[in-house]
Amino acid sequence: WAAETAQGWDAVSALQRAKSTIRVIIVPKTATQKAAASTLVKVLSTLTLRPGTLAVAGAHTLIEPTKYRNASSVLGRGELPLSNLVYLGLYENDGETGAYTAGLDQFGHPEIEIVGSARGPEAVYQFLENLVQYVIDTGSKLRDGDELQISPTESVGIKFSKGVALPSVKTVKVSY
């Protein structure tokens, strides 16, 4: 499903033109998951410079090489390019917005879902992106039954249960 989730370009066509693939795996023996992810992004960014590179399979989707490289530029500031590592899916159903992660498990965290939010897609996406960045940066664990204080006047509940967008795994549901 990686080609079908690609955003802003015809990844299916690129995949059909592909004649070969290169698989890169970083196995952290002593490095942290964040350090291993940083190394992986650096290697893949370099490989996108090769002539004929059509796509990078990352974050559970196919990413256009230039877009992958551009997102990787945040490594110079000591940040991880979230869009290259964790896919943020967004959907609408009966006037409600939902969102989910795919790839957060690679950092030792369960996938996160927001289900049935009355907020708009942009607000839900931005909240999920900020939450994922926070979880990866701090290593904080979201636990069943916890409340997450998101502003001085607002908190959201956390529940761990079978996934909605990802039914094959248990996910953390955040009631945003």
Annotate each PLM feature.
Residues 62-176:
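Aromatic/basic-lined ligand-recognition segments
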